[in-house]
Amino acid sequence: MEIKKYFFYALFFLLFFCLFLSKLQAYKFNMSIVGKVSSYTKFGFNNQRYQPSKDIYPTGSYTSLLGELNLSMGLYKGLRAEVGAMMAALPYDSTAYQGNNIPNGQPGSRTDPFGAGIFWQYIGWYAGHSGLQVQKPRLAMVHNAFLSYNYKKDKFSFGVKGGRYDAEEYDWFTSYTQGVEGFVKYKDTRLRVMYSDARASASSDWFWYFGRYYTSGKALMVADLKYEKDNLKINPYFYAIFQRMYAPGINITYDTNPNFNNKGFRFVGTFVGFFPIFATPANQNDIILFQQVPLGKSGQTYFFRTRFYYNKWQFGGSVYKNIGNANGDIGIYGDPLGYNIWTNSIYDAEINNIVGADVINGFLYVGSQYRGFSWKILGRWTDSPRADERSLALFLSYFSNKYNIRMDLKLEYYGNITKKGYCIGYCGMYVPVDPNGPGTQPLTHNVYSDRSHIMFNITYGFRIY
């Protein structure tokens, strides 16, 4: 009888809810409930035990699971609201048996209560709102919770959004922000300002709760002015991490065929310049996980990219150059490259040396697509004072429109030579007599590490309403 009673309660609620929605349609109300589930695996071919005394620094492997649900509502004439939540899990972590040399009492050490391995630093990492005090991992978050309003009349429009939401179309900021932004646009020119109180990585390969870990406990503000007409886009901007960094920059892009639809020819050329000025002492180290290079007083980033399209084929190349430690405070949680730069090793900095101090990178790629299948081959050459890297990667992707399933596979050869005088991992920790014990010390010679790996991601999307 109890089951029958609750069934009728649920049926009554459903009928009432449907009637309520039908009435709201007259007021321009609309709603959707969508979600996805995904699994991500990175498997490093260098899967030996961690033995720094023998110059063995493995890559590490892990598998994560992610579930997501989002409710989106169009409330009334340009007013929208969205709320969504995510939950992650870490079913496999190779570092549980590969070991590490983190001192006892520190996050990730042998006595760490958070887990037998250290990949919780990727899936679940939480260091409080400040981003500076490591706490118990968080495997669930409300990543979307915002209100937005957009108004448009003739050639004039403006909009505002506040809460937690996915930050879009920023050269040096990606993923989710907790904050507010607004824009004003007239004809082909738009002014936009964003204030970010905290940032979150919300994906199947990285799951970090909202915090200020990427700005050393400070807030971030961005202002950009974009002019876009026909084939040309000119986008000057300014990024500020208060009391730490101030950075003007510009993106200039020329596109011969903005409405390209896989037929004919298209060329897209992009130049990005970024010029951070640091307000911290010149000898203070960067926040990149290397933490081995002083920030200095200023830096420069120059990025040139060419992309060619012919029917379903594409090819091109790019050059990325840092003068000084330009990305020491920004450029690691968002960059204009368009490539995943977090593919190194958990035993070093997972981030590549692509954004290191005084680095120069070259990229070449070719690819094509057929129906739901696409492929790409990407080669990378990286030289920097800290490390040199060579990489050749094959990307395969397939999307089934019928079943709403996407599969992505990457197979990458990746070699890294870390140079004498630098550390693989954190420098400056206590180093005992045991060379495999706690602590990391500068290398006495160059060390080659195989960072080759395979990545596989499968995602199923669904719609409830």
Placement of each model-derived feature along the sequence:
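Beta-barrel outer-membrane channel/assembly domains of diderm bacteria
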Residues: 22-160, 368, 377, 395-397, ...
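Residues that define the transmembrane beta-barrel architecture of outer-membrane proteins
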Residues: 29, 61-67, 138-143, 174-178, ...
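Transmembrane beta-strands of outer-membrane beta-barrel proteins
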Residues: 29-37, 79-83, 156-160, 182, ...
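Extracellular loop and loop/strand-boundary signature of outer-membrane beta-barrel proteins
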Residues: 52-57, 131-133, 165-168, 208-212, ...
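Residues on the lipid-exposed face of transmembrane beta-strands in outer-membrane beta-barrel proteins
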Residues: 67-73, 145-151, 180-184, 223-229, ...
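Outer-membrane beta-barrel translocator/channel fold
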Residues: 91-95, 192-233, 237-248, 257-340, ...
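Surface-exposed coil loops of outer-membrane beta-barrel proteins
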Residues: 109-226, 233-236, 240-242, 337-355
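C-terminal structural cap/anchor segments
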Residues: 322-399
